[in-house]
A protein has these predicted regions:
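Short, basic, alpha-helical segments at the C-terminal edge of helix-turn-helix-like DNA-binding modules
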Residues: 1-5
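Hydrophobic alpha-helical connector segments
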Residues: 7-37, 41-54, 70, 77
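Generic detector of contiguous secondary-structure segments
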Residues: 17-26, 69-74, 103-118
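Hydrophobic alpha-helical bundle segments that form small-molecule/ligand-binding pockets
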Residues: 55-77, 88-108, 162-165
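Small-residue-rich helix-loop
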Residues: 81-83
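C-terminal peripheral helix-coil segments that are non-catalytic and often amphipathic
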Residues: 93-174
Length: 174
């Protein structure tokens, strides 16, 4: 099983932020070892048939420790699972089956030929973006991982959860 060690027990004294960050990192590492299952996880409801109750329990424990309560803990749980699966599924998307070498070369040529007058910011940042950013890449994260974006994404998810909790503490609806 690819995910047997993704969700270790959440000790009550542990910081929920660090535990969630570790969850995202372990999940990504597991999928990097088994990238062929990535497209199945987010795209087919049948992936739920391999339910991992320990994963659900530990995510809920971390969210409860953060301060989420019913019914909002369900929304937070869904957001965490979607975040955990989403980025990595996109990052590890497989190459097309039909002539992947020509497909990659054609896409690279199309990206590099974009006119600056139509796409000034894209062309200005093309050397930074080319094959290192979603939409303008021609290699999968299997070969060319998007680690910096993943780390920023995890930071954003955790900061978003913190923001929701702090709004609730300030009296706004969370």
């Amino acid at each position: 099983i690819a995910f047997h060690d993704v969700a270790p027990p959440f000790p009550p004294q542990e910081d929920w932020r660090g535990w969630l960050r570790g969850l995202f990192e372990r999940y990504r590492q597991s999928l990097q070892k088994h990238p062929n299952i990535a497209p199945l996880l987010g795209a087919q409801l049948v992936s739920n048939s391999g339910i991992n109750p320990l994963l659900v329990e530990q995510i809920l424990a971390a969210l409860k420790a953060a301060g989420f309560e019913a019914p909002r803990i369900v929304d937070a749980y869904n957001a965490v699972v979607a975040a955990m699966i989403g980025y990595v599924t996109l990052e590890l998307a497989p190459m097309p089956d039909d002539d992947p070498v020509d497909w990659a070369a054609e896409l690279e040529d199309r990206v590099r030929a974009l006119p600056a007058e139509d796409y000034p910011l894209l062309v200005e940042h093309l050397d930074l973006l080319s094959n290192k950013a979603f939409i303008v890449r021609w290699q999968s994260g299997r070969v060319n991982p998007l680690t910096g974006g993943f780390e920023l994404y995890v930071d954003m998810v955790i900061a978003g959860l913190e923001g929701i909790l702090s709004r609730r503490k300030d009296g706004a609806a969370a």
